[in-house]
A protein has these predicted regions:
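Residue-level signature of catalytic and energy-coupling elements of molecular machines
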Residues: 42, 98, 190, 242
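N-terminal cationic and glycine-rich segments that engage phosphates or anionic surfaces
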Residues: 19-95, 101-102, 106-150, 160-165, ...
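Long, charge-patterned amphipathic alpha-helical coiled-coil/hairpin "stalk" segments used as oligomerization
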Residues: 116, 121-227
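Small/polar loops that bind or transfer phosphate-bearing groups
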Residues: 100-101, 193-194, 231, 238
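Short phosphate-engaging motifs
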Residues: 104-105, 197-198, 235
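Intrinsically disordered, compositionally biased charged tails
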Residues: 1-30, 255-305
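Short glycine/threonine-rich loop/turn motifs
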Residues: 200-260, 264
Length: 305
């Protein structure tokens, strides 16, 4: 598949982390990722033209073979803005909740979130995770209790039926809440891979006024994110790259933060009134939205140079 050429006067590809100079002699600030990396990861491949959101029109460069090609010039600029925002949050000792439950992003979300000690959800979004924090906190406490009983060998002393039941409960809680087990309060922002897939997370974050950073493909609504990163959310390499860059921003901010920045404020936890008034019943919101099929033809290979 032919790769659209990019105007050299707009951008001169260079290695990540190095300053660049355009043809006019202007110094371009250091990039958080190179254009070559974006191309090789297939970040520019969007969805088929018949499956798109018109609001993404401004981020589309062209169309090739029935597939939209995303404008990587904009992707690069917006990714740098998202990187800077994530860095600023980390500098203040804040936290970013990573969310990516689709198969293509599960690995990257877990690996990168753990690397920078951030909470994450990569199995399924439990309804009310943000809006019903009080109830979720009780479940997290239960998770820690079951982990302790297992580590101390207490579960082995129970009758077989009861032991199996508690181990099953532990497995389920670990899958759903393991990534947020150490989250003591609501995050300062949410980073989402695929807005269309993670509608529950989007709705809860927006209800609470939490900033949303998102990798947004051509079939999504960019208005649902505060920091839009236009790009392919169906290719593993694309997800890996974007998630890593956001994590790099957090890591850079953590290196500048002081220990005092990580001390939770007295009012860090949401007020009970807000938790009750805005809460979304956990049991009633268990069901996930149906995942967007990924069966469509979508180029993900490395473009020929």
């Amino acid at each position: 598949m032919a790769v659209p050429a990019f105007d050299g006067c707009r951008f001169q590809p260079g290695p990540t982390g190095s300053n660049q100079i355009n043809q006019k002699g202007d110094l371009i600030p250091m990039s958080v990722v190179s254009m070559r990396e974006l191309l090789e990861a297939g970040v520019h491949f969007g969805h088929q033209t018949r499956r798109w959101n018109p609001k993404m029109r401004r981020f589309i460069f062209t169309e090739r073979g029935g597939i939209y090609i995303i404008d990587l010039q904009q992707t690069l600029q917006l990714l740098e803005e998202a990187h800077a925002f994530a860095r600023n949050i980390a500098e203040r000792g804040g936290s970013v909740l990573f969310v990516g439950t689709k198969k293509q992003s599960q690995g990257a979300v877990e690996v990168q979130a753990k690397r920078v000690n951030m909470p994450y959800v990569n199995h399924r979004w439990l309804g009310g995770l943000l809006t019903n924090w009080r109830t979720i906190s009780d479940r997290i406490d239960r998770l820690h209790e079951l982990r302790r009983l297992k580590d101390e060998g207490q579960l082995d002393l129970l009758p077989a039926k009861e032991r199996i039941s508690m181990l099953s409960e532990l497995e389920k809680l670990d899958a759903n809440l393991g990534g947020v087990a150490d989250m003591k309060r609501q995050p300062d922002a949410v980073f989402i891979v695929d807005l269309k897939k993670e509608q529950l997370a989007v709705r809860e974050a927006r209800r609470l006024g939490l900033p949303v950073i998102a990798l947004v493909d051509t079939n999504c609504d960019p208005d649902e994110a505060d920091y839009v990163v236009p790009g392919n959310d169906d290719a593993i390499r694309s997800c890996d790259l974007i998630v890593r860059v956001i994590a790099d921003g957090i890591e850079a901010g953590q290196q500048k933060a002081t220990p005092a920045d990580f001390t939770p404020a007295k009012n860090g936890a949401p007020p009970e009134e807000e938790a009750v008034a805005a809460e979304e019943p956990v049991e009633g919101a268990e069901a996930e939205p149906v995942a967007e099929p990924v069966a469509e033809t979508k180029a993900e290979e490395v473009p020929a140079e």
